[in-house]
Amino acid sequence: MIYVDADACPVKPEILKVAERHGLEVTFVANSGLRPSRDPMVRNVIVSAGFDAADDWIAERAKDGDIVVTADVPLAVRCVGAGALVTGPTGRVFDETNIGMASAMRDLSAHLRETGESKGYNAALTSRDRSAFLETLDRLCRRVKR
């Protein structure tokens, strides 16, 4: 199973492509509108607009043998702790060896934004990022199928 934190996820088409190739189910979870899919391997879940509702839904279900796609570091922390394989939309893998540092960097960035030291702009996703994501997701899919 691939769980996707789908609000503002820029790699949905890539996820569908890789999941289809590997025969894995995909669940897109969001607070609002998702495009319907006729594919029986794709499920859309709309959660309440509450704070972290999509994150909570995914974190309550993700387990060993699942893949989670998210750019949200706190969600990644929870899913890594549950044994899931986690990647961001740029192909960055979050695991037990780097999730602590990712969380610390997120907290530092939030502090810098609050103090006005940083504007907090996120770079646009590049074609190189998309390629790295495709490679990472393909590798994670092969790993869960073993």
UniProtKB/Swiss-Prot annotation:
Annotated Pfam families: DUF188
Task: Report the CDD domains cross-referenced here.
Answer: PIN_YqxD-like
Q: TM spans, by residue?
A: none
PANTHER family under this entry? UPF0178 PROTEIN YAII (PTHR35146:SF1)
Of which family is this protein a member?
Belongs to the UPF0178 family.
Record-given protein name:
UPF0178 protein R01393
Q: Which organism is it from?
A: Rhizobium meliloti (strain 1021)
